[in-house]
Regions:
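Bacterial Sec-dependent N-terminal signal peptides
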Residues: 1-24
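Outer-membrane beta-barrel channel domains
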Residues: 22-258
Length: 258
């Protein structure tokens, strides 16, 4: 996910985010582990067990870009109009007296090799992100991704049998070599005071530390949720409601409410 995150980092790192600091750090498990370890070393008050992290909570104690080794591209192309729009500026910025709307592309292309199955693996992702704020109390974020991928055999077996890719949603065959799938997530945050905020969205949440969680993991597909965060001094209380769905084509009508 190097390319995808590099573009995210450039977008979220612009001065615009300072006007409304309710955006999440992009939620990739491997990166969360590095950020979690770096935050723990600072011994600063930080609630690491509830993810995704807020940028407003991370940036006072660590620099996420430095921890993850993100280095902005500084070549000649980066100084051109196209390069600036890809690496350091927002592609589209609509500003108005009480806020702004920012639109940016997101790309990812990775390749690998499954030696046991003698198979070349790859993922091709194209997407768009939209974020903005209305005054100091309202922030919003949304993204959409279209993907094609050649998967390792154990994931191909799941996709062929159930019609889904774990954590990625429904899939359909892509030519004869892979699978096609798409997903979206987003959220709206209302922060009436410094010590409380209300967030409604569709996405993933994680409760716990480390790679896996028995309480709430990020393995499930995106789901609608309502979250209320209340914080006073070193105490933080989170209320979380969500609705999980079994999205297998044959069981799409069966919901599990929590």
């Amino acid at each position: 996910m190097k390319i995808l995150f590099s573009i995210f980092a450039g977008v979220l790192g612009t001065a615009a985010f300072l006007q409304a600091q309710h955006y999440h750090q992009p939620f990739f498990t491997e990166q969360q582990l590095h950020l979690e370890a770096a935050a723990a070393k600072t011994r600063a008050p930080f609630f690491s067990a509830i993810k995704p992290y807020r940028l407003s909570a991370l940036r006072p104690i660590i620099n996420p870009d430095s921890v993850l080794g993100v280095k902005p591209y500084r070549g000649k192309f980066a100084r051109s109009w196209t390069g600036r729009k890809l690496f350091s500026e927002d592609l589209i910025r609509i500003a108005f007296p009480q806020g702004q709307i920012l639109v940016n592309p997101a790309f990812d292309f990775t390749m690998g090799r499954d030696f046991a199955g003698n198979k070349t693996l790859w993922t091709n992702t194209r997407g768009v992100t939209v974020r903005g704020n209305l005054g100091k109390m309202f922030s919003f974020y949304s993204d959409f991704y279209e993907n094609q991928a050649a998967l390792p055999q154990y994931l191909s077996d799941v996709a062929d049998t159930m019609g889904i890719i774990p954590g990625q949603g429904r899939s359909k065959p892509f030519k004869s070599v892979g699978y096609d799938y798409a997903w979206a997530n987003g959220y709206v945050v209302f922060a009436p005071a410094q010590w409380v905020d209300i967030e409604f969205g569709i996405g993933k949440n994680f409760i716990g530390d480390g790679y896996r969680s028995l309480l709430l993991s990020d393995v499930a597909f995106n789901y609608p949720y309502l979250k209320i965060n209340t914080q006073f001094w070193r105490f933080k209380y989170t209320n979380l409601w969500g609705e999980f769905q079994d999205i297998r084509p044959s069981l799409a009508g069966d919901n599990l409410n929590t």
